[in-house]
């Protein structure tokens, strides 16, 4: 019982902590960097990206600073595609459990150039910008907090349901593996006994021919 409570507590802490992929990295011309995120079914996900301007005086980005972006589900058509852009954003609701991947490619350019990419990806309850909603609709702080808590509770429920499904899948896999191992052990035993019987028969035949028995 204590273990169950501890697991639920850890799950709540994990969901209340920021589930955000936020990074800044360098990417050379024609190179690709892919980032994956494990997302469960019906979870909301949003992301944004842009090339950091190397010009201190905020001049327009040079022609070499363009990227190609693709966001791919576990299977099926791409959820987002952008060709030769400087910045962009995407949003989707996951239609199946699995690993969703975002790939960013710097365009091929000579001479080779190094781009600095700023990438931000939020999933689940953290993808819903309640702060912006509160500002736009001018709701009071109490209503804002209630909405945030309700959204967190829903997210916890969905996460627990997802974990229960994964546990059932693992149990089914274990049962299937144990069954296969049992049949494999039985087959190995039959083969060993058959080989032992053939060896015994061969030795008996050999000794009879030699008239040793």
UniProtKB/Swiss-Prot annotation:
Name of the protein this chain belongs to: Transmembrane emp24 domain-containing protein p24delta8
Coiled coil: 163-176
Membrane is among the record's keywords: yes
Signal peptide: 1-22
Assigned protein family: Belongs to the EMP24/GP25L family.
Region (Interaction with ARF1): 202-213
Superkingdom of the source species: Eukaryota
Subunit structure: Probably oligomerizes with other members of the EMP24/GP25L family. Associates with the COPI vesicle coat (coatomer). Associates with the COPII vesicle coat (coatomer). Interacts with ARF1 (GDP-bound).
Keywords: Coiled coil, Endoplasmic reticulum, ER-Golgi transport, Glycoprotein, Golgi apparatus, Membrane, Methylation, Protein transport, Signal, Transmembrane, Transmembrane helix, Transport
Glycosylation sites: 97, 174
Cytoplasmic side: 204-213
TM region(s), chain numbering: 181-203
Lineage of the organism: Eukaryota, Viridiplantae, Streptophyta, Embryophyta, Tracheophyta
UniProt topological domain (Lumenal) ranges: 23-180
